[in-house]
Amino acid sequence: MAGAGQTMPDGRPTPTGLEVPRWISLKSSHVRARQGPGLDYPILWEYRAAGLPVQVIAETTEWRKVCDPEGAVAWIHRTVSSGRRSVFNNTDAEIPIHAGKSQTSPVRARLQPRSIVSLDECEDGWCRVRARRLEGWVVQRAVFGAQSRA
């Protein structure tokens, strides 16, 4: 698959054929972050937030080197990640979720600090997000995980 045309930041082809950097999310609330790409490397910490968006900054066939909302970098196994997109409010302030793509559009809800919601799409500086039955728009730059590239 490496011949799919995608490359890592240093120009090498990616093992998966997917773009690097790219956004993924954590599948479970127990994801071990390791110092290197393999079970022989020490566990640095454990992520406890299913759906947390992280950015893949390098990869091997089985492992993904990711950067999290705090800027920490570690390796996770491919099986604990998902291609589903999500965003995270990594600020101490609530982020308004609007009915439409406008600051003047009615506020449907507020994304609480340290909260995760599903990401549907981003356009014109706005991202459509979902949480349970709620759907709305947030300013793209206000959330972690919505940027198109590093």
Per-range role (PLM):
Residues 2-35, 46-50, 57-60, 67-101, ...:
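SH3-family beta-barrel domains
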